[in-house]
UniProtKB/Swiss-Prot annotation:
Taxonomic classification: Bacteria, Pseudomonadati, Pseudomonadota, Betaproteobacteria, Neisseriales
Keyword check for Membrane: yes
Organism of origin: Neisseria meningitidis serogroup C / serotype 2a (strain ATCC 700532 / DSM 15464 / FAM18)
Subunit details: F-type ATPases have 2 components, CF(1) - the catalytic core - and CF(0) - the membrane proton channel. CF(1) has five subunits: alpha(3), beta(3), gamma(1), delta(1), epsilon(1). CF(0) has three main subunits: a(1), b(2) and c(9-12). The alpha and beta chains form an alternating ring which encloses part of the gamma chain. CF(1) is attached to CF(0) by a central stalk formed by the gamma and epsilon chains, while a peripheral stalk is formed by the delta and b chains.
UniProt-listed Enzyme Commission number(s): 7.1.2.2
Protein name: ATP synthase subunit beta
Amino acid sequence: MSQGKIVQIIGAVVDVEFPRDMIPRVYDALKLDENGLTLEVQQLLGDGVVRTIAMGSSDGLKRGMTVSNTGAPITVPVGKGTLGRIVDVLGTPVDEAGPIDTDKSRAIHQAAPKFDELSSTTELLETGIKVIDLLCPFAKGGKVGLFGGAGVGKTVNMMELINNIAKAHSGLSVFAGVGERTREGNDFYHEMKDSNVLDKVAMVYGQMNEPPGNRLRVALTGLTMAEYFRDEKDENGKGRDVLFFVDNIYRYTLAGTEVSALLGRMPSAVGYQPTLAEEMGRLQERITSTQTGSITSIQAVYVPADDLTDPSPATTFAHLDATVVLSRDIASLGIYPAVDPLDSTSRQLDPMVLGQEHYDVARGVQSTLQKYKELRDIIAILGMDELSDEDKLTVMRARKIQRFLSQPFHVAEVFTGSPGKYVALRDTIAGFKAILNGEYDHLPEQAFYMVGSIEEAVEKAKTLN
């Protein structure tokens, strides 16, 4: 095992000099002899000097300190022993519940599955959230992004999806908290514990307070655990269907941006690292379904300043099967989940996959809402009275649809006081189809606000009269 000495420290970036004949490879993990801090090699600068990123705080480091090469990338524990536990980027438990009971470990840097190993699926994953199931349905083994600016409900939506899918899902889940609030990580842990599904979830946290090196790699640690569960074969030679939640993928990009300039790279558009697309691709190409097992991933994506054309969310879009866009305009109307029904898309929105009825209802809802959007300027200037009877009817139905797309969440019960609702897909389709066909034109629009199925709207209308 070769040893080197620290020659330069700039924030999270540390340069280490090794003997010329014992230079470590890129991505090798180095360990500081004095305090056990892990460094990951990023570049070979020549003359025996390597540039590394610290996985923890670089406070207190001095030039001349001894560093040992472990000869391998960062490896983390995997397997059943990680379930119900919280680990950090290095796989070290941080929940004060003793060491992790597993003898298996894996390097966090793995090659993506080969093209002939991949498998595609068109089986739908019911979420119980009306707007998602109707307009941007998820596929089992697919990739979903929840896009939104600050405070429009990405984490709450993700928690509700975890509540509806992970609890009903008999398989295993991995949750990677990348650069988010520690409080949310804590809430998630207790939510899982109270629901008695903690023994099916592995949690990997690298929260906001961690140095950039830690946040840059914590998503890979979580993914490595999920990949192991996917690839581990049972007696029939089949892998598992794993759920992989990431909150938030933007912080992964941001951590790369923070260290990019320190690594000596020229910044690209908006100050992002020039390797943005490659870094994102390396992570996303591993989150995939193979012929052995599947990973269904749900990723929250922060949108800086609500600008979807920002390079970070724009790069993420290319990798996803379904995009759920959360809108501040819809949130300001008090409609939650604040999903934009016209911006959100899914590859599954196809009559060959969904069936003709679901497809027709979804497109009918979107065209009604689009027509309403076009008429809003006229209404603002001239008022409703200037519209034709047909347009008045369209506006009335669109406003009912808009309100019916809202839904009380289980995870928000403590804030709203309304019990959460899970709506089956067939009830969702039947409800919207009836509104489009004019069966509920006689009901007031507030009857459709924050209810589950259409029957609840009818009951609510009785109390309003």
